[in-house]
Amino acid sequence: MRSVILAPVWTGTVAFEESVMVVENADGSVNPISLLHPAIEILEVKSLYSGIIYKDGIDYALDENGNLLILSGSSIPVTAYQDIYLKESIPEKSFQKHDGGYLRFSEDGFFHKAQIAVTYRHAGEWHGNIPERQGDKLSKTNAMMAAKKPLKVLFYGDSITVGGNASGFLKLPPYLPCFAELVVAEWKKQYGYEDIAMINTAVGGKNSFWAVEEAEKRMVAHSPDLMILGFGMNDGKTEPKVYRDNIRFLIEAVRSVNKDCEIILIAPMLPNKELTRFWGNQRLFLRELTELASQYPGIAVADMTTMHSELLKRKAFLDMTGNNVNHTNDYLTRVYAQVILETFK
């Protein structure tokens, strides 16, 4: 199962458990649902939360454009428009939109329970960006794994690195772990040994300024062989050059105790662009991280910014979010892991 969920979404001809959230329009209608690839054949539609498998021709169908159709009388959960787009604020359950009104926010499993997972065949024609393989920049870590030497991997980041809102984080079926656990488990499998220690010191809601303040305790003290750094989502109001300086500090701090520490810098996914509070400079940080990586040996950039942008060309933000603001669901958690694993090759 693990190898299937980590099969890159940009390869192959079968999409496995791609998440979709069915939401009504304001008039109560439901549009055909665009999948990441135009589907040729639907193999399965299910709820990952309940395990219910829905029936072709009764609950759903496939249209001539490769979209998923929700049929009248379907058992598939359909979320009412007014349950997402709110007229009034609900304390701790909503955020203000740019154009007025409010959007539903939840970290209690609301979105996970409402989403369905679609497995389908497609033509395998991916025209979007493919993450760059940068294993040559991480040669020391690759060599340690190849020789099955003890390896210490540190994940330092915000709530996405903690695991929000993967189902394991929510303590709900199917209990998918955070991307950090997925990545390390896959490395153990690929390289055939268990002596890869994972340390995750990430904390939700934190930005790169906090990362600098906590660097000694949460990063330097561990002296990792490989560090995977995931800050930026909560830096939306931070100027890109200031963000770059903060990340530079972290690079130099960890290398002050281990000059051979190699680093993967994660360019973050995008927040919900409808919200005033979180949308900001996140899309600009890729350039800063790429520039930093060019200035030091042993640093690669895992580009989730571009990958998420590619996914959003065909899929709704609601299809891939765990909280409707700035967290992954199971599907996007898997994509995070896929991008990091591809970057490491």
Residue ranges, per PLM feature:
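Active-site segments of SGNH/GDSL-like serine hydrolases
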Residues: 230-234, 253-285
